[in-house]
C-alpha cells in the first residue's frame, strides 16, 4: 500500500470493479491514516461488507495490492486466512504404504490430484493392480457429479541410469569402502557378480572414455565418492574421497560429464507400451539430457499415446544447460532435485530450480517441483520447519505441482503428508504477489493471432478488473484452461469438459479445477453451452468458490469442437 495519506494508490484502481470505485473512495478516504491505514487495520469482514464479497474472498489482500515487492513482504499477515481453494496440484507417489483402495480414497479426500507410479521399482503386474486401485478409489466419488474429483495417473520411467554390479557375497551382501583406499571401477564382465571393497563393476561400457582424470564418481546417491587418478586398460583407478557401506546394484552418477547413454532403455520401451495399454495420462521421462530424448519418448508412445503428456525430468548438468531445447519439445518440466543435487553442487540446486520454474512460467508450460519436500514425514508425523518453508517457496517460485515421493510410497504417514502439503500450499498461494506477477507475464507475452490465446489473456485481465470470483471455461482438450492458467489469475479457473482425459491432465496447470460433464450434448448447441456453464457455477457454489452476487468470467467457443475459443462473457451468480 502507498504510504500517502488520504489518497488511494492509482495502481489499486484497476483491481476494483468500476461500480465499486465510489464506494471504495468513501469508505477509505475518510479513514484515519487514509486508505493505507484503513487497509492495514480493517478486517476482511469489514472490507467484504463495504466493497463486495468477490473482491475480498482471496486473502492477504493488502500485501497483494502493495506498490513494491518490498512493501508486499512487509504487509504479509500471519493472522490472515489461507485461500479457500488450493491452486497448486499435489502429486503423490503410490507404493506399499498407499496402494490400497481405502488408503487411496483418504489421499484423494486429503487433496491428491495426480498419482505417480515409479517404474524403477515393481513389476508390470504390480503396477497394473495399483492402476486398478487408483481408478476404483477415484470412481467411488462419482456418485455426485458436482463433487467428483478426477485423478490423473503418471508413469515415471526408470530412464537411462548407471548401476554397480552384484557383490561377491550375493545381492544382499555389503562391503565397506574405506576412505583413502584405492578402488578399481571396471566394466570387465568377470567382475559383474564378483564385486568387493577393491573392485566395483559398472554397467556403462564407455565410462573410461567419458570420465577424465580428476573427475568424480558418486555411488548410492552420493554417499560414496571416488576421485579418478588413472585411466588404465582394466578400468578407472580411483581414490575413495568419502567412504561408506556399499551394496549391490547401486546407482552411479558422473557429475559434469556428458554420457552417451541412449535416451530410452529396452525396459523403458516396454514400460511405455504398458502405459499406453493402461491409458495413463502423463509420462515423467527420467534423466532427459537433450531434446532428442523427449522425441524418442514421443515416438515410443506411438499414435495410440499421442495425447499422453510428457513431462521431462531434469536431473543432470547437461539437462540444465540444454534446458531451452528440452522445454520446447516437452509438455512440461519436473525439477528432480534428487539426482540433480548430486550432478551439480548442492548449493546450486536452488538456482536451477528458480531458473527452470521461471522459464516454464514464461513459456506457459507446467512445472513440477520434486524430491525431499517433506522427507522427514517418512518416519515422523510432522515435517521440519525447513521442509515447510521449502514447499512454500516452491509455490512462491511458481511451481504448478509439488510432489511427494517416499513420504507417500513407503512412509508411515502418507495421508498426513498430503494434508500437510495442502495446508502449506494454501498459505503460500495467498502470499503470491499477483499484481506484479500478472503484469510481468502480460508484458512478456508475445504478439499473437491465435484467438484462443488472445481470449485467455483478455479473460484474466478482465477477472482482475471486475474482481471476478472465478473464470469458467468450456474446453475439449484442456488447452484453453492451460492458457488461462499461464497468466496466473487470482480467480479459480473452473474447466468444464466432456473429456475424461482432459479433466485429469489439466491438474498439471496451476489454479485449474476440472469438472467432468457427463450429460449428452443438447440438440441446440447454445443450450448445451448454457447448461455446461450453469454446471460450472453450481459446482463453484458447492465448493465455496462462488456466492450469490459474485461475478464470473465465462470463456467459450463460437462453435462446437476444439480450437474455436474466442468468446468471453461476464455473468453474475444468482
Curated annotation (Swiss-Prot):
Beta-D-fructose 1,6-bisphosphate binds at residues 475-480, 525, 532, 559-564. PROSITE patterns: PYRUVATE_KINASE (PS00110). The record marks 313 as: Transition state stabilizer. Its EC number is 2.7.1.40. Keywords: Allosteric enzyme, ATP-binding, Glycolysis, Kinase, Magnesium, Manganese, Metal-binding, Nucleotide-binding, Phosphoprotein, Potassium, Pyruvate, Transferase. There are 4 isozymes of pyruvate kinase in mammals: L, R, M1 and M2. L type is major isozyme in the liver, R is found in red cells, M1 is the main form in muscle, heart and brain, and M2 is found in early fetal tissues. ATP binds at residues 118-121, 163, 250. This is Pyruvate kinase PKLR. Pyruvate kinase that catalyzes the conversion of phosphoenolpyruvate to pyruvate with the synthesis of ATP, and which plays a key role in glycolysis. GO terms for biological process: cellular response to epinephrine stimulus; cellular response to insulin stimulus; glycolytic process; pyruvate biosynthetic process; response to ATP; response to cAMP; response to glucose; response to hypoxia. It holds the Pfam family PK_C. It comes from Rattus norvegicus (Rat). CDD domains: Pyruvate_Kinase.
Amino acid at each position: 500500500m502507498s504510504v500517502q495519506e488520504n489518497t488511494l494508490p492509482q495502481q489499486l484502481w484497476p483491481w476494483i470493479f468500476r461500480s465499486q470505485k465510489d464506494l471504495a473512495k468513501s469508505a477509505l478516504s475518510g479513514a484515519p491514516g487514509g486508505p493505507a491505514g484503513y487497509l492495514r487495520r480493517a478486517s476482511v469482514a469489514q472490507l467484504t461488507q463495504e466493497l463486495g464479497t468477490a473482491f475480498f474472498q482471496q486473502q492477504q489482500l493488502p500485501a497483494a495490492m502493495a506498490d513494491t515487492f518490498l512493501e508486499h513482504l512487509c504487509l504479509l499477515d500471519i493472522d490472515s486466512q489461507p485461500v479457500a481453494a488450493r491452486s497448486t496440484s499435489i502429486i503423490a507417489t503410490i507404493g506399499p504404504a498407499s496402494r490400497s483402495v481405502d488408503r487411496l480414497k483418504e489421499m484423494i479426500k486429503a487433496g491428491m490430484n495426480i498419482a505417480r507410479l515409479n517404474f524403477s521399482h515393481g513389476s508390470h503386474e504390480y503396477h497394473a493392480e495399483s492402476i486398478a486401485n487408483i481408478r476404483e478409489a477415484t470412481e467411488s466419488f462419482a456418485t455426485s457429479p458436482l463433487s467428483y474429483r478426477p485423478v490423473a495417473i503418471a508413469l515415471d520411467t526408470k530412464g537411462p541410469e548407471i548401476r554397480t554390479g552384484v557383490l561377491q557375497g550375493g545381492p544382499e551382501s555389503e562391503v565397506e569402502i574405506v576412505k583413502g583406499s584405492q578402488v578399481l571401477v571396471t566394466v570387465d564382465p568377470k567382475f559383474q557378480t564378483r564385486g568387493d571393497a577393491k573392485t566395483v563393476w559398472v554397467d556403462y561400457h564407455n565410462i573410461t572414455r567419458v570420465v577424465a582424470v580428476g573427475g568424480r564418481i558418486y555411488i548410492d546417491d552420493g554417499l560414496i565418492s571416488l576421485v579418478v587418478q588413472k585411466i588404465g586398460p582394466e578400468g578407472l583407478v580411483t581414490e575413495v574421497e568419502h567412504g561408506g557401506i556399499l551394496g549391490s546394484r547401486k546407482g552411479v552418477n558422473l557429475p559434469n560429464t556428458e554420457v552417451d547413454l541412449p535416451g530410452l532403455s529396452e525396459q523403458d520401451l516396454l514400460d511405455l507400451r504398458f502405459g499406453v495399454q493402461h491409458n495413463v495420462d502423463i509420462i515423467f521421462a527420467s534423466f532427459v539430457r537433450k531434446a532428442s530424448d523427449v522425441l524418442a519418448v514421443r515416438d515410443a508412445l506411438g499414435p495410440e499415446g499421442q495425447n499422453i503428456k510428457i513431462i521431462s525430468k531434469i536431473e543432470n548438468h547437461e539437462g540444465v544447460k540444454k534446458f531451452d531445447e528440452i522445454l520446447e519439445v516437452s509438455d512440461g518440466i519436473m525439477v528432480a532435485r534428487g539426482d540433480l543435487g548430486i550432478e551439480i553442487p548442492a548449493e546450486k540446486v536452488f538456482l536451477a530450480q528458480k531458473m527452470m520454474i521461471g522459464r516454464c512460467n514464461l513459456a506457459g508450460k507446467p512445472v513440477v517441483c520434486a524430491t525431499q519436500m517433506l522427507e522427514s514425514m517418512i518416519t515422523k508425523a510432522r515435517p521440519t520447519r525447513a521442509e515447510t518453508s521449502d514447499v512454500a517457496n516452491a509455490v512462491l517460485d511458481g511451481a504448478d505441482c509439488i510432489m511427494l515421493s517416499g513420504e507417500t510410497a513407503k512412509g508411515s504417514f502418507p495421508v498426513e503428508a498430503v494434508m500437510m502439503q495442502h495446508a502449506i500450499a494454501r498459505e503460500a498461494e495467498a502470499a503470491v504477489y499477483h499484481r506484479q506477477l500478472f503484469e510481468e507475464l502480460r508484458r512478456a507475452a508475445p504478439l499473437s493471432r491465435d484467438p484462443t490465446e488472445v481470449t485467455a489473456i483478455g479473460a484474466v485481465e478482465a477477472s482482475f478488473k471486475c474482481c471476478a470470483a472465478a473464470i469458467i471455461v468450456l474446453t475439449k482438450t484442456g488447452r484453453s484452461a492451460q492458457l488461462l492458467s499461464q497468466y496466473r489469475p487470482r480467480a479459480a479457473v473452473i474447466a468444464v469438459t466432456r473429456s475424461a482425459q482432459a479433466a485429469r491432465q489439466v491438474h498439471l496447470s496451476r489454479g485449474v479445477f476440472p469438472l467432468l460433464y457427463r450429460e449428452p450434448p443438447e440438440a441446440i448447441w447454445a443450450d448445451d453451452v448454457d447448461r455446461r456453464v450453469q454446471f460450472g457455477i453450481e459446482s463453484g457454489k458447492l465448493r465455496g468458490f462462488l456466492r450469490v452476487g459474485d461475478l464470473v468470467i465465462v470463456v467459450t467457443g463460437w462453435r462446437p469442437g476444439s480450437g474455436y475459443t474466442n468468446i468471453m462473457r461476464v455473468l453474475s451468480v444468482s
